[in-house]
């Protein structure tokens, strides 16, 4: 026995694996002796106290066969095991890896039920012949009595169905859908998908059948989409019922710091000079040509002269009322007194222009 264990270790070394150490070989010998001692006691007990016909030198398979026979199972010489009286046919014998080709009559295996959705066809051009694929137009009328069991009658009735759909004799035939089957690419739907195929709309140009949003008067539809250039839509008065639009400047700290009243000279500028200041974005002033209508689009002057710069004037220190006055932060080379700057944070009121 010692030589056999040593030979096994030597064979493992010849196979290219690591040669076990002396302590590992000793542990393997001790473990094998313990296993064989336990097996010998089991065999002795079965022979003494049980009705088991075990050979003198038997292995574990013999013990398993004996236990199966006592429990009412039958073990054939090739290892096929089954309950007594429920011998499976030859075609249903399990394969070498243990899988059964079909469930045995006495097994608890139940085949899974059929899926709730219709199987997809092999081709994306025609509906499956195994499902109900008749064409229904309008209600429950069947064109030509076409069923899904045959493909040739379905192909023959294609011109008939197209003529029915395009004919004016049937004004009420609006809905064209397929019950079951699929005419799209074969896609496996999820388990939670509905079993009914959605309808195909064919009444897009019919004036009598309109979507529900076409006839209703929704105020959010014209306001949420930009109007066309030739058609202007006034906003709904209901949208502006709770708003108060103030003509005063916004309550922004930057806006209040630009000028005490940047547009207070608007009326005087119209009468005195050709340049006026029009409110633009962020409270800035833009030079425009005089004589333009008040609500017309602002046209910028291409070549603005140098005397229009912030705080500059052609008359020296005498600033004309129509020019833009720069705020104190933009005067880089000048010193501004602290008392000339008034902070009006959080207030929408503008103070009068100091003269």
Swiss-Prot record:
Q: What GO biological process terms does the UniProt entry carry, in alphabetical order?
A: brassinosteroid mediated signaling pathway; DNA-templated transcription
Q: What is the residue range of the signal peptide feature?
A: none
Please verify whether the record's keywords include DNA-binding: yes
**Keyword Transcription attributed:** yes
* Annotated GO MF terms: DNA binding; DNA-binding transcription factor activity
State the family it belongs to.
Answer: Belongs to the BZR/LAT61 family.
Can you name this protein? Protein BZR1 homolog 3
């Amino acid at each position: 026995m010692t030589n056999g264990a040593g030979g096994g270790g030597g064979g493992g070394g010849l196979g290219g694996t690591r040669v076990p150490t002396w302590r590992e070989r000793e542990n393997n010998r001790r473990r094998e002796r313990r296993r064989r001692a336990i097996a010998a006691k089991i065999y002795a007990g079965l022979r003494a106290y049980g009705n088991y016909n075990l050979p003198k030198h038997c292995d574990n398979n013999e013990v398993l066969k004996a236990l199966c026979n006592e429990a009412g199972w039958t073990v054939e010489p090739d290892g096929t095991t089954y309950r007594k009286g429920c011998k499976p046919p030859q075609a249903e014998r399990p394969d070498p890896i243990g899988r059964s080709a079909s469930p045995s009559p006495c097994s608890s295996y139940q085949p899974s039920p059929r899926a709730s959705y219709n199987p997809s066809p092999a081709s994306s051009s025609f509906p499956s012949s195994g499902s109900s694929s008749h064409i229904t137009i309008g209600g429950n009328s069947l064109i030509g009595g076409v069923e899904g069991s045959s493909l040739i009658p379905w192909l023959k009735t294609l011109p008939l169905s197209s003529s029915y759909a395009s004919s004016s004799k049937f004004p009420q035939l609006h809905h064209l859908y397929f019950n079951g089957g699929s005419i799209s690419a074969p896609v496996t739907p999820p388990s939670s998908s509905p079993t009914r195929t959605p309808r195909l709309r064919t009444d897009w140009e019919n004036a009598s059948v309109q979507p529900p949003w076409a006839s209703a008067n929704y105020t959010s539809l014209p306001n949420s989409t930009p109007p066309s250039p030739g058609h202007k839509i006034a906003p709904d008065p209901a949208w502006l019922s709770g708003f108060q639009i103030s003509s005063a400047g916004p309550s922004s700290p930057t806006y209040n710091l630009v000028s005490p009243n940047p547009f207070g000279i608007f009326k005087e500028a119209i009468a005195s000079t050709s340049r006026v200041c029009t409110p633009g974005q962020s409270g800035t002033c833009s030079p425009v040509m005089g004589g333009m209508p008040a609500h017309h689009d602002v046209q910028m002057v291409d070549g603005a002269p140098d005397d229009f710069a912030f705080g500059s004037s052609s008359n020296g220190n005498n600033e004309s009322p129509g020019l833009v006055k720069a705020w104190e932060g933009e005067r880089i080379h000048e010193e501004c007194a602290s008392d000339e700057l008034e902070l009006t944070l959080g207030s929408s009121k503008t103070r009068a222009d100091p003269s």
